Every structure is written in structure tokens, then in C-alpha cells.
């Protein structure tokens, strides 16, 4: 429990209007309390950490000077919005972030009127803010609209599409874009723009000019002296900063300024509030600011489990192998014997398990920044030249490159392997990061082969199978650990389109896909039913399914994907095409976006854990409920 008496100023702030009652001279103390409160609260509950520490001063300045929620703040990505949540009526609930029934991990319109746009994926803020500014302009509304973008989001093409549109409009919309430049996404930001911004902020000449002025005038600058120094600095900045890029796109550029210097932020924002048309303010921040361990390990402290801020994160001992670990090990093993293998990630080196590969095979590793569309077509181009690219990508981010998957890869039947991490139920990160649609949107694409492993050993075999297959393949696996089946060191392959009969029983066939094989087997063995590990979503094992349809009363399909258009739909379509009428119960995720909760709670809620499978069976075939098989036996 947090002692509010340790935060006397912050305790007076329930909404931003309360913040505006403070004198500007008091805001430094408010910022210190807010940063310390964030450290203490996230230490208790876990959650996104370093990004929020980096925008404490910026968040305070924005809510202090802008009349939120009338004025609109549009945050990009959302990792950095814990300070925003704390200042907008959710301070006492911040420790519930990511927990079932608690605060969402990202801005969410249903949660607060101060959350003007729901986010979780990157690079959407400028487009959304521009849309708001256009409508305000049409209505003659004087509200201010501010997009805050950073954490690598400016490496995505969508941001430039919005800048290009906004800067070329007539009449010009009143829009402020704040570039929060911390040179990071989750991993280090990469690419030409990042290097250009780095040249601006790291210029020795510019810093020498700035520091020289401080030494000469100290804290005794008059207003006239301060104006002179600002003009002199702006003149020199023009020689070092990327103002030309944004100016040519139709934006008035201001910066770069220190994003932790509250007087500088307040001064710049006061001026920008009075200006018309598209404006861009470039601020330099440090991810993890104010917590030394996070500043020193910005990747490690991006998102954290509960920890003691006095001690920092404790290095975990030996842990159970995750599916991501299986992929990471397989990738390096296959690269050792297959020189054609190239690996691509859209800014998710750590999360997708590419750290070791990037170190051992740096010339074969391509981090394209937050650019999923480019990543996939880059892979397509590589494949045309005989390479075998492996695209390591989260299921939720694969959605952002769907046209490229369809048009550039599948249409041309190019040899690209998609290692789709975080498929199905993801858990605490909520709806924006769930992988509950991928089986549906991949299954319908011609030329695609699609697999989902039941365990770690099978995941390795599927990756090898996909690598050696001629054509586009997706291996879709979940977040976290599996049942603990240790993979072989071999690079064995599976026969394409062949399922695995796990248990030969009678009456009902339970068809499990991916992680849902485990509950199917737990229930099926107990009740003497047939259990199948389907392995392939596409192509399905037609021979086995037709044989089972001939010898069983009904099927139950079980998948951690939405039922609509999913793996079970494929089974029904196959039987229908053969003119076979058979009762089928489809178990899967509901036609709804997942909320944040633990994976276990979400699986149970969807009825695809062992207890849910058992209950569904009894609902359709009540006579299966014999005395020897109570619900408790399989829950």
C-alpha cells in the first residue's frame, strides 16, 4: 500500500484542473513526486516502466498548459502514459494496471475522457490527431490537438503519411506534433532518421554553444539576454538539426529542447499554443529518467514484473524454456547449416528472440525498425533472389503487414517463413496485443501453409518443416511456456498435412489445435474419447478427418482463436464439401476483443481449458457425465 502522505502535492491532484492551481515554480516538486510515485507503484504491481519515467515533465507541462480534456492529447503507442493516467483521476488505481478488472495498460477511450484515442500499436497518433483537428476546424472549434509520438514510432511509414497530409492541407489544420526523441523503441531505435536525429542532439558544436552561454551568463540572464541566446542557438541549430525535413513537409519546427527542463518546455508550449497551422516540437528525453538502473538498462526496464525499487530487478535463475526460446535456439541452429537463412524483425529483437542470432550472425540479421509492411516485402524481395528469409513477428503486428503478406508473398508463392509469436491468448497486455485473429486471417490466404505446435519439441520441428517447404509458411506459437517437452537437437521435419492421433477412443473425436491439444487430451483420455493433435490448420489432414467422421458420432474442435473463420471452420468446410453431416461443437475465443487478464483466466473464460471442454461435451452429449468422471477430475 502506498503512503499518500509521502506525496503531499500529488495527493492534491485528482484531475488536471487541480494541477493548474499550482504555481509554475512548484511544478518541479510535483514532477519529482510523480516520478517517485511511478517508481513505487510500478514496483508493487509491475507494468510498463522506463518510457513513463521519460515523459514525466512533458506530461505535466501538457496538462498544465492545455485545457484537457477539452484540448485533446493523443499519445502514440501508450507505453509512456502511466504519468498521464496518474494525473487524470486514476492515481489510486495505477497498481491495477494489466490486472483483470483493473486499468488498461494503454490509453482506452472507455476508461477515461482524457484518453482521446485508444492505442497499443505504434505510429497512429498523428493520423488520429489530424482527424480530430480537421473536424475541429470544420466546426469552428478552437480546441487544441496535440500528438505525442516517440519511442521509435517515427520510424514507421504511417507517421510520414500523416505528416505529408497535414503539411500539404489548405486551409492548414491547427495541429501540434511533439516528437519525444529518446532514441529507443522497445529495443534501440534504428535507421537513417534515428541517426539524423542523433546528429542533431549529439552535435558537439551545438552543445558547446549552449554550455558556453550558460558559463558566461549563469543564472543572471536578463530577458533581453535570454532572447539573444535563444536566437543565437536557433541560428546554430539550423546547421545541425533535421528542421529542413519537417519544414519541407509543411510543419513549423521548434527544437530540439531538453524534455526534462520544465521551464524550457513550458516556454516552448506557451508559444506554440498561440501559433496557427502544423507545428512540430522536438524534445530530447531519457527513457528511464530519474531511476538510475532504468537509465542504464532501458530495454530491461521497458516492462517489468513487481520488484523492489531499492534493489532493482533481480536476475532470474534457470527458468522454463518458452516458445520464443525454442525459436531463438532453432534459428541459430538452422543458420549454422543453412547459409540462405536471413532473419528479419520489425523492432522486436528481444521480444521475438533474436538477440543471440543478431550477435552470432550480424550480417544476416535485419532490424527494419517499426515497419511491418517493409519487413514483409523486404523478405519477399530476398526470396526472389534465392534467400530463405525468416520474419519473426508478433501475431498482433502481423496484422499491420497483411496486404504485403497477401500481395507480395503469397500471391507470388515466395519462400518466406513467418515465425508468428504471441498467437492466441496473450494476457495482461490486453486487446491491442492479443493474437486471437491470426488463424482466421492466415487460413484464408491462398498458397499459405499454417501450423500450430502443441508443445516445444513440435514447435522446433514445425519451424524446420516450414523452412524446407517451398512457399509461404506461418508457424504460430503462443506467449510463454509450454508443457515442457524438451526439443531434440536435430532439425527434423514433419510430414506436411498429417495430424497426430494422440488417443484412440470412441464416440467423439476431440480435434485440438496448438495449445488446445493439452486440454483436449486431458479430457479425452479421461472419458475414453479420440484425441487428435491436428498440427496443421492448412492443409488439414483430410484422410484422417474423413475416417474419423465415418467412425464417430461427432467432433469437437478446440482452438485459441476466434471461432469465426478459424481452424474449426476449416474442418466444417471440409466435411461439407464431402457431403458429410456430422454434429460439430466449435470451441474457441468469442467474437470479442480480449481484455487484459492472465492467460489462465482468459482461457477459462473462453471455455477452452479442460473444465470448459468438459462442460461443452456434457452440454451436447449429457450421457458422457458418468459417476467416474466428475468435472473436478479434469479441471
Swiss-Prot record:
The cellular component terms of Gene Ontology attached to this UniProt record, alphabetical and capped at eight, are: cytosol
Coiled-coil positions are none
EC number of the protein:
2.2.1.7
Cited InterPro entries: Dxylulose-5-P_synthase (IPR005477), THDP-binding (IPR029061), Transketo_C/PFOR_II (IPR009014), Transketolase-like_Pyr-bd (IPR005475), Transketolase_BS (IPR020826), Transketolase_C (IPR033248), Transketolase_CS (IPR049557)
Q: What this chain does, per the record?
A: Catalyzes the acyloin condensation reaction between C atoms 2 and 3 of pyruvate and glyceraldehyde 3-phosphate to yield 1-deoxy-D-xylulose-5-phosphate (DXP).
| Record text on subunit structure and interactions | Homodimer.
Read off the PANTHER family from this record: 1-D-DEOXYXYLULOSE 5-PHOSPHATE SYNTHASE-RELATED, 1-DEOXY-D-XYLULOSE-5-PHOSPHATE SYNTHASE, CHLOROPLASTIC
The entry sums up its family as follows: Belongs to the transketolase family. DXPS subfamily.
What name is this protein filed under? Answer: 1-deoxy-D-xylulose-5-phosphate synthase
GN (gene name): dxs
